[in-house]
Amino acid sequence: MASNYNYEVRIQFKEKNPLLTEKFQLMVDYKKSKGNQDRFIFAPSSIVLKLKRSRKYKSILSNPQNSINTQIIKSIIAYYSVSSIYSQIKSIQINYIEGKNKTPLLESVTFQQPLQISIPIQNNLYFKKEIIQEITTESEKGECIRIALSYWLKAQITDDLYVGFENLWRAFNRLYVYYGKQSNENTNLCEIRKFIIANAHHFPQTIKITNSYLEQELLHSFRWQKLILNDYPTQKHTQALIDFIHRYTDKRIMKLLQEKLVCREDNIKSLGKWNDIQNYLNSNKNTSSDIELVTLLCIKYAYFLRNKFFHGEILNGTFKLTKDHIDLEFEKLNKLLSMLIFELVNNNILP
């Protein structure tokens, strides 16, 4: 069916994005577009969409399945992703165009802010402009990135560590499920771990964060013994624990395992493997593998916390009278996860 109906959407922001010094435009597909494309025009403080459709719509913003609605959301995610400042949306105007006449859709007068902010927020992590092409592409990868960034952006504006962690984990979850393409969660996590290690050179800023940890900080800022007891709770899990140990070689990880494995010493000894494990740890006492520390914290440890948190096994993180070591733990993990997701997307290395 021919696209006979013209629409124009104008989104105005309260503040200018200093990184967008001039207008640029893209031709963007939409679902079931059959080769038709919309024009996205990005400017420092605005987005303009020019669209053609095969019917006249009475409602757009209130219909999440409407292709114009999805294009609006797509453009806003792209705009915020390449912004060095998160600004409120000042206005949204949707016009139906017939000849030289513009008829405004009244529903666009009222809308909610996708990012719930009352004042502009400076953002130090902004994606390169070229990534907009990936964000707006109508493909499995494009959809994955948009979903991930919708959560990642929410995490950037919250002061609540636990809300931040939830959003960051959901963003990371979407990326590793897309990459792993398996129904099993652990399989997908194993696949993204291998991918990150194989592409270590793409994660310099994430590695910089983990490399800044002093030995005692790494040992005592995280609950390693609780992780070991939780993930390997009985004798029958001992071989899995041994396999876990052998996946790592970095000297810092060897050091913390030497200190924390005592909680499962009897189980390991029952298999006659204690001396072998000690020899393995000692043989790697001078080995460096920076990316392993990233995967240990962002995948193994964060997944342990995620399960405790999402399954309601621990108190709500904010139900307390003063800040404690668990808050500091989430603070560190949020910083790490945020950077890992940023580098995964910004370097455009996912296939």
Which ranges hold each PLM region?
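Charged, non-catalytic interaction/linker regions at domain boundaries
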Residues: 1-163, 323-347
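Amphipathic, oligomerization/interface secondary-structure segments
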Residues: 136-328, 344-351
